[in-house]
Amino acid sequence: MAFQLAGFFLILALGLGHYFSNDQESRCRQLELYATKSIIPTTPAMSSFNTIATPHGALTIPVNWLYPEVPKVTSAHTNCLFIAAALQVDTWEHSRPLKQSCHAQDLPEHGQCHQGRVAHYSAYVNSVSAVQQVIQFAASHRLRLAIRNTGHDLAGRSSAPNSLQLHTAGLKGIDYVESFTPQAPAGQSVPSDGPAVTVGAGVLTGELYSAAAEAGYTVVGGSCSTVGIAGGWMQGGGYGILTPSRGLGVDNVLEIGVVTAQGVYVTANQYQNQDLFWAIRGGGGGTFGAVVHVTFRTYPDSPATVSKLNVVSPHGLNSAFWEAITDLLRAIPVLVDRGDAVQAFVMPVMPGNTTFLTIESYLINETHVSGLDVIRELKKSMEARGLSVESSEESFDWLSAYLAIPKGLDQAGMGMMTASRLVSRELMTSAQGPSLISQTLAQLSYDPGNVLSLEGMVGGPAVRGRETADRATHPSWQSAVMSLTLGHSLPSAPDWTAYSRAQRELAMTQLPALQALEQGTMGGYLGIPFPYESHPSRVFWGSHYDRLLTLKGRWDPDDLFLTRLGVGSERWDEEGMCRVGRAQAFLWWYSSIVDRVKSWTA
């Protein structure tokens, strides 16, 4: 103990010297790119940009800037793939600090329309060389660079005010091979990793699922068909219905092609650039480099059964409903341990004081009669508690056929604030664990439009069977069996008071209640984050953060790649434009050291 405390004070002394030394200067990124309001920029920097980006460089304006001259803007605003400036959660197109926005629902015919957090310029790239040129341009001019694939981000990480956007949606290509051999240093012979598929950064999950169904294989992917599978989904960990049986998205990555902050294209796998390979697989998107393609392990196709329960509690959030949630929580680890997946959504406050619950179960690799028995028993118990339950079951000869069913365009242009925490298998399978979770959720307050998600597809045999150090995600993924998400619906048209109220409720009441379930030992999912986490390093990476921060300094010493909540973001202001002062940086560093000492003495 004395040795540990002595080490702490030594670190503290060194830290004081580092953070208050004269060479730790604050600085801001340049704004010369945006020195003109002309539609055709005339600054020297923009002349250079137009040269390297033509024909793909463009001025970016908020979607509704064209309203009402283009009436279709209002309806197209809910299309995920509409335009480079559009984000799935359009509250991140607004600037809360400046109270600036541009929204059709709140825009008078001749009213003001502000840029908000929408990038000023966008470079739509469709080749590795184009990515390299844009990165070199941004680095040479010290610009704020934001990487956007499809704009599916719940914390505003694919956009930033006063930024240049690297739009990777044009990096298409799906290449399936029966035997994939990773690239290795010259003279080194490596074995084949078996069947695999290489996808460009712009390939959507639905596009890959369609290609897989045609070729007869399956691949681990998410539930949203318009998410770029090689982007933030994979780089944040990535889970889906195959995760319990096949692992997380990052567990199935064999090779990554990435452009570094120096504009150099490199290959990262288990044979070369291993540190970068580790960091990208869970360290967060837009942080260590611009990923241009990823090779995923594939699996043979298999039968599957999809079961759905639509549950209505006619008396709302009464004790019978929460007892039914306890029943569901007991069933989830049973199914997940079999390699199956469960996804449940609760709409707590609906018209007429009713509560809706939908449960989808994915039984993989066989008809799973015993798995269906679990679900049928769950249905009976819910009905016995006075809930109305409608059920359906559909079997598929091939799982790939189900995954490839067109899902339509995912809803965009919506307002939402979320927070998530992982829940351990140990708690879920304990005698009192499910009741404790249910009672905790019952004590929270809910408003119309709130959503509660219980996803039993983050853990399972394939996740537990891997070493914690194999991936950069929070170590608690190893023991997790469920992700619990709280969602607050927000007005799409800017309502600054509503935004603050949702943030306060999540930060002060709801998240602390979830944290207390397991004394803060479980992390959160970076893909569904609370945008205002006070300690993102602790929540999303835990003990892996120190190594990630070291690798960030090695591969991107100037923090060209930066996102909200991302590795290294504590060194910058909220939008990544200016480095924070020495005192503020020290306070963050000091709090992390105190946390470490507390863990030593616990």
UniProtKB/Swiss-Prot annotation:
Pathway(s): Alkaloid biosynthesis
InterPro entries: BBE, FAD-bd_PCMH, FAD-bd_PCMH-like_sf, FAD-bd_PCMH_sub2, FAD-linked_Oxidoreductase, Oxid_FAD_bind_N
Phylogenetic lineage: Eukaryota, Fungi, Dikarya, Ascomycota, Pezizomycotina
An example Gene Ontology molecular-function term: FAD binding
The keyword Glycoprotein is assigned to this record: yes
Protein name as annotated: FAD-linked oxidoreductase phqH
Cofactor(s) this protein requires: FAD
EC number: 1.-.-.-
Organism whose genome encodes this protein: Penicillium fellutanum
Membership in a protein family: Belongs to the oxygen-dependent FAD-linked oxidoreductase family.
